């Protein structure tokens, strides 16, 4: 399997960037793993073979296998379609935070853990998501809520633990959701702006997608997180539901 590049965008009107007479192309993001798995029929094949669970991880983190047995056990006992390993995260830290998003619900950091446990028992619905929110979006999202921003709780950490892209999927559910959606994960753009008005790009940007956005392909299926320590160490230079272990 090989990921294809996508055309780069030169401005807010999404005009295609051209360099030296050729369309400029960039990677589409690791969310393409879902489309590639579906295109090659692998989740459906694995489900027919009786395989139940799939682990996805990034090779910049050498420690994910420390968590594998525990996160598999949690995934089975909770009936999760996707389970994310999460780590303690400081407020404002440049790591995505895993949150329970409930439309129309206020966010109260003093009640977040209780809400997450209630959500586990209730199960996910089409209006609720346990999902990663990127750090540059998390604080602005929370500023308009009673939380007032991404602030520490009594532990000194953010109530929204860090996503490290160690993800366990239930193969049967994954195959069904990818068959329904074609494995197409919702896309976004994250341009570097050249002006305060955010009207010009510093350089061409790209449409991209992320593998941890799989919960956005799910309705009714339960997606959660397992909070763990000492399962994350970068091998490169760095530039909701809750179960404690």
Feature annotation, model-predicted:
Residues 1-51:
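Conserved N-terminal catalytic core of the sugar/cofactor nucleotidyltransferase
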């Amino acid at each position: 399997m090989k990921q294809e590049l996508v055309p780069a965008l030169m401005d807010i009107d999404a005009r295609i960037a051209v360099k030296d007479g050729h369309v400029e192309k960039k990677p589409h993001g690791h969310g393409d793993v879902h489309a590639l798995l579906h295109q090659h029929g692998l989740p459906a094949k694995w489900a027919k073979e009786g395989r139940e669970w799939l682990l996805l991880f990034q090779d910049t983190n050498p420690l994910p296998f420390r968590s594998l047995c525990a996160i598999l056990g949690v995934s089975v006992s909770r009936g999760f379609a996707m389970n994310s390993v999460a780590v303690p995260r400081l407020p404002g830290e440049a790591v995505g935070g895993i949150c329970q998003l409930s439309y129309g619900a206020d966010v109260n950091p003093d009640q977040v853990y209780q809400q997450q446990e209630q959500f586990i028992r209730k199960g996910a619905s089409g209006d609720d998501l346990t999902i990663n929110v990127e750090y540059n979006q998390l604080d602005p999202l929370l500023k308009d809520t009673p939380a007032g921003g991404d602030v520490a709780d009594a532990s000194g950490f953010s109530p929204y633990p860090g996503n490290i892209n160690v993800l366990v999927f239930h193969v049967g559910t994954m195959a069904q959701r990818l068959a329904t959606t074609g494995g197409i994960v919702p896309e976004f753009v994250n341009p570097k702006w050249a002006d305060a008005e955010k009207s010009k790009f510093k350089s061409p940007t790209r449409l991209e997608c992320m593998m941890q956005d799989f919960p956005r392909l799910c309705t009714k299926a339960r997606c959660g997180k397992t909070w763990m320590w000492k399962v994350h160490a970068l091998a490169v230079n760095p530039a909701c539901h809750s179960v404690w272990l």
